[in-house]
Amino acid sequence: MPFIYINILLALTTALLGLLLFRSHMMSSLLCLEGLMLSLFIMSALTTLGTHHTLSITMPIILMVFAACETALGLALLVTISNIYGSDYVQNLNLLQC
């Protein structure tokens, strides 16, 4: 396994560990999710470059589109939670309340 794949797997693991450890604040969870998506994008782009298939070129682009949608929804949710509750704690996000 090349050295760059080991670095990307380490970044992916660090982002996942950060998501598990810092899940009390919404902003830190969103940052860890972005790191996770960026690591997945780089890994899929490098894999696509290594395979030389023309049909697999669109996979990293589609992944970035989903990452941008996730970012927009996450920031909208963060702004809504901050305006309603005054903080960005994930525990304020209770979907069972009316």
UniProtKB/Swiss-Prot annotation:
Gene3D superfamilies: 1.10.287.3510. GO terms for biological process: ATP synthesis coupled electron transport. The chain crosses the membrane at residues 2-22, 30-50, 61-81. Its EC number is 7.1.1.2. It is an enzyme of class 7 (translocase). It comes from the Eukaryota. Its main location: mitochondrion. Keywords: Electron transport, Membrane, Mitochondrion, Mitochondrion inner membrane, NAD, Respiratory chain, Translocase, Transmembrane, Transmembrane helix, Transport, Ubiquinone. It is found in: Mitochondrion inner membrane. GO terms for cellular component: mitochondrial inner membrane; respiratory chain complex I. The keyword Membrane applies. Coiled coil: none annotated. It catalyses: a ubiquinone + NADH + 5 H(+)(in) = a ubiquinol + NAD(+) + 4 H(+)(out). It is a multi-pass membrane protein. GO terms for molecular function: NADH dehydrogenase (ubiquinone) activity. The keyword Cell wall biogenesis/degradation does not apply. Core subunit of the mitochondrial membrane respiratory chain NADH dehydrogenase (Complex I) which catalyzes electron transfer from NADH through the respiratory chain, using ubiquinone as an electron acceptor. Part of the enzyme membrane arm which is embedded in the lipid bilayer and involved in proton translocation. Belongs to the complex I subunit 4L family. Core subunit of respiratory chain NADH dehydrogenase (Complex I) which is composed of 45 different subunits. This is NADH-ubiquinone oxidoreductase chain 4L. It comes from Bradypus tridactylus. The gene is MT-ND4L.
